[in-house]
Amino acid sequence: MSSRRSSRGSISEEEINELISKLQSLLPNSRRRGSSQASTTKLLKETCNYIKSLHREVDDLSDRLSDLMATMDHNSPGAEIIRSILRS
């Protein structure tokens, strides 16, 4: 990637477009857009919102797991399965 950088060390427009395209491919339900500034801004906002939703989902799953573990016998086979999953 550094071979495509200009002598100033900045990122080329081509590299930015490639990175935007890669980012877009990581988002669920992402549609093809033009390379305009408005589309890039919208894509970055969607990315931030998606990351926030993933954080909320992780927090929710963590809470649910904590609740489940609190109600289980810590020596039960189910508790051991959960511990082994968390270790992996």
Swiss-Prot record:
Disulfide bonds: none annotated. Homodimer. Interacts with APG. Component of a nuclear cell elongation controlling complex made of ILI5/BUL1, LO9-177 and BC1. Binds directly to LO9-177, and interacts with BC1 only in the presence of LO9-177. This is Transcription factor ILI5. The lineage of its organism: Eukaryota, Viridiplantae, Streptophyta, Embryophyta, Tracheophyta. Residues 1-54 form the bHLH domain. The keyword ATP-binding does not apply. Induction: By brassinolide (BL). Accumulates in the dark. Disruption phenotype: Erected leaves with reduced lamina angles associated with lower cells length, reduced internode length and small spikelets and grains. Impaired response to brassinolide (BL). It is found in: Nucleus; Cytoplasm. Atypical and probable non DNA-binding bHLH transcription factor that acts as a positive regulator of grain size. Involved in the brassinosteroid (BR) signaling pathway. Binds the transcription repressor APG and forms a heterodimer of antagonistic basic helix-loop-helix transcription factors that regulates grain length and weight by controlling cell elongation in lemma and palea. Contributes, together with LO9-177 and BC1, to the promotion of leaf inclination and grain size by modulating cell elongation. Belongs to the bHLH protein family. Plants over-expressing ILI5 produce increased grain size, caused by elongated cells in lemma. Keywords: Brassinosteroid signaling pathway, Cytoplasm, Growth regulation, Nucleus, Transcription, Transcription regulation. It comes from Oryza sativa subsp. japonica.
